[in-house]
C-alpha cells in the first residue's frame, strides 16, 4: 500500500481531532454533586426546635415554662405538617420527644421510636426474656397504695383491678406485695423503702399527686417506679407515670372537636375542682389548635333558665360550632332541652367522662343521646382477661358506678408493669387496656387514648372512628 504526503496530512488532522475529543471527554466526566437542600420546616416548628435545644440546660420553673412554650407552638401546626417535620428530625434531636408526644395525643403514628438514650429510657433489669407479644413482667412487684387515709376509698378499686389482671394471667407472674402509704409524704417514702428492702425490682404507685412529687423529688429511686398519678415533677429516667387526670378529658375533648372542624365552642361548666382543671386544659388545647371558646356559662347544681345566656352565645359573630359540657350527668340532662330550644341540639356536643356514670333514670328518655364522651374501653368492648363491665359490676362492689373507672385503671396498671418495655422500644407500641389504648411518650408519661361513646337510651354505645 502506498502512503503519500496527502495521506499524511489527513492523518495529522484526524489525530488532532481525536486528541481534542479525548480532552473534551476528560473535561466533561467530572460531576459536581451539590448537597440536597435541608427540608424546609414550618416556622413554628423551627422555633420549637430552637427552644428544645436549650431545654436540657434549664431547671425548675424555667424548664417547665420552656416545655409549655414548645407544646403550644407544636399545637398550632396541622397534622400533616407536624408528621412531615417530625420525620425530618435527625436521630437524637431534642425536639423529637415533644413532637412524638404531640403526635400520640392526636392519635397519629410515630415516624420512628423515641430516642430512649436521652430524657427517658426503660431498663428491664434481670427479667427473663420477653414473650412474643412483649409480655415481660418484673420479678417482684411492690405496690404502694393509701390503704388508710383519705384516699383509701379510691385505693380499693385500684387494688382489685390490679389483682384481677394479675390472677387472670396464666404465664409467669411476679411475687407481689402491698405497702400502705397512709396518703402522706412520709408514709410514701417509708413504703418505698420497705418495698426495696424486701427485694422488689419494680414499684407501682403511689396514688396521690403530692406523694408522686415527693417520691420523684427524693433522689432515692434505686428501683424504678410506675406512679399512679401525674404531679408537677417529671418522671426520673427509668420511671414512668400513669394517670386518669381531668386535664386528659379536656385535652381529648378539644382534639375531638378540632378533628371535626368545630373550632368555635360554647362551654357549660360547674365549679368543682376537677371540672375547672378539665375546662382549663380544654381551653388551652383548643386555642393552641386555632379554636375559640365563644362563651363560658357557669352552671349550678340545679340549672335554671339559661335561655338568655344561650341566645347571646349563639348570636355572636361566627356563631357556635359545638358545645362542651363539663357537667355532672344530672346537670347535662336538665340542660339538654334548653340546648335544643336555643338551636344547639343539632350541634356537636361533647362531655367529660363524668357522663359515663349517668343512671338509667337520666338516659332512658333519650335526652342524652348523641352527646359524645370519653369512656373506659371496657365499658363498650371486650378486654382480654376481664369479664364484661356489667358482669363484673354484678359481682364486685368495687367495679360498680364511679368505682368502675378506678377498677379499670388498676387493671391497666398491671398491664403496664408487664408490657412497658414493648411500649418503650416500639415506634407504634401500644396496649389495648381497659381504660383505652395505652402508649408511652419520650418523657415516661403514659398516653391514654380513651374510647368514645354516646347514649342510645339507657345504653352506652361506642362511637366509631371517634378519636381526636
Stretch-by-stretch model annotation:
Residues 195-208, 225-228, 264-269, 317-332, ...:
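Periplasmic-binding protein-like
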Residues 239-298:
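An alpha-beta-alpha
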Residues 233-256, 365-377:
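Short beta-strand elements at the ligand-binding edges of bilobed clamshell
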Amino acid at each position: 500500500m502506498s502512503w503519500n504526503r496527502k495521506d499524511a496530512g489527513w492523518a495529522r488532522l484526524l489525530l488532532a481531532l481525536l486528541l481534542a475529543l479525548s480532552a473534551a471527554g476528560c473535561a466533561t466526566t467530572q460531576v459536581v454533586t451539590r448537597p440536597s437542600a435541608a427540608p424546609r420546616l414550618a416556622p413554628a416548628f423551627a422555633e420549637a426546635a430552637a427552644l428544645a435545644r436549650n431545654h436540657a440546660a434549664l431547671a425548675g420553673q424555667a424548664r417547665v415554662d420552656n416545655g409549655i412554650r414548645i407544646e403550644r407552638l407544636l399545637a398550632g401546626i396541622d397534622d400533616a405538617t407536624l408528621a412531615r417535620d417530625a420525620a425530618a428530625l435527625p436521630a437524637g434531636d431534642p425536639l423529637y420527644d415533644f413532637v412524638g408526644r404531640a403526635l400520640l395525643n392526636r392519635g397519629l403514628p410515630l415516624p420512628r421510636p423515641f430516642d430512649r438514650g436521652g430524657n427517658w429510657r426503660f431498663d428491664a433489669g434481670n427479667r427473663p426474656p420477653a414473650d412474643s407479644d412483649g409480655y415481660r413482667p418484673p420479678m417482684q412487684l411492690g405496690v404502694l397504695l393509701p390503704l388508710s387515709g383519705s384516699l383509701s376509698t379510691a385505693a380499693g378499686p385500684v387494688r382489685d383491678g390490679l389483682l384481677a389482671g394479675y390472677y387472670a394471667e396464666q404465664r409467669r407472674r411476679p411475687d407481689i406485695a402491698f405497702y400502705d402509704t397512709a396518703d402522706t409524704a412520709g408514709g410514701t417514702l417509708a413504703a418505698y423503702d420497705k418495698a426495696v428492702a424486701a427485694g422488689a425490682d419494680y414499684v407501682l404507685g403511689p396514688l396521690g399527686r403530692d406523694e408522686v412529687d415527693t417520691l420523684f423529688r427524693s433522689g432515692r429511686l434505686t428501683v424504678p417506679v410506675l406512679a399512679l398519678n401525674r404531679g408537677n415533677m417529671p418522671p426520673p429516667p427509668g420511671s414512668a407515670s400513669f394517670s386518669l387526670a381531668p386535664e386528659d378529658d379536656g385535652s381529648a375533648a378539644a382534639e375531638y372537636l378540632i378533628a371535626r372542624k368545630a373550632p368555635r365552642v360554647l362551654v357549660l361548666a360547674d365549679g368543682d375542682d376537677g371540672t375547672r382543671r378539665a375546662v382549663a386544659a380544654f381551653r388551652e388545647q383548643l386555642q393552641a389548635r386555632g379554636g375559640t371558646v365563644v362563651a363560658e356559662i357557669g352552671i349550678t347544681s340545679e340549672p335554671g333558665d339559661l335561655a338568655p345566656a344561650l341566645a347571646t352565645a349563639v348570636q355572636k359573630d361566627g356563631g357556635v360550632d359545638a358545645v362542651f359540657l363539663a357537667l355532672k350527668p344530672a346537670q347535662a340532662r336538665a340542660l339538654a332541652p334548653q340546648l335544643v330550644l336555643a338551636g344547639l341540639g343539632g350541634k356537636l356536643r361533647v362531655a367529660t367522662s363524668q357522663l359515663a356514670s349517668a343512671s338509667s333514670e337520666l338516659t332512658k328518655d333519650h335526652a342524652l343521646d348523641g352527646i359524645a364522651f370519653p369512656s373506659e374501653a371496657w365499658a363498650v368492648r371486650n378486654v382480654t382477661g376481664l369479664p364484661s363491665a356489667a358482669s363484673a359490676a354484678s359481682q364486685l362492689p368495687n367495679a360498680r358506678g364511679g368505682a368502675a373507672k378506678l377498677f379499670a385503671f388498676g387493671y391497666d396498671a398491671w398491664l403496664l408493669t408487664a408490657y412497658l418495655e414493648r411500649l418503650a422500644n416500639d415506634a407504634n407500641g401500644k396496649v389495648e387496656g381497659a381504660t383505652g389504648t395505652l402508649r408511652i411518650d419520650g418523657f415516661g408519661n403514659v398516653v391514654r387514648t380513651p374510647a368514645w361513646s354516646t347514649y342510645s337510651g339507657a345504653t352506652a354505645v361506642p362511637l366509631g372512628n371517634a378519636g381526636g
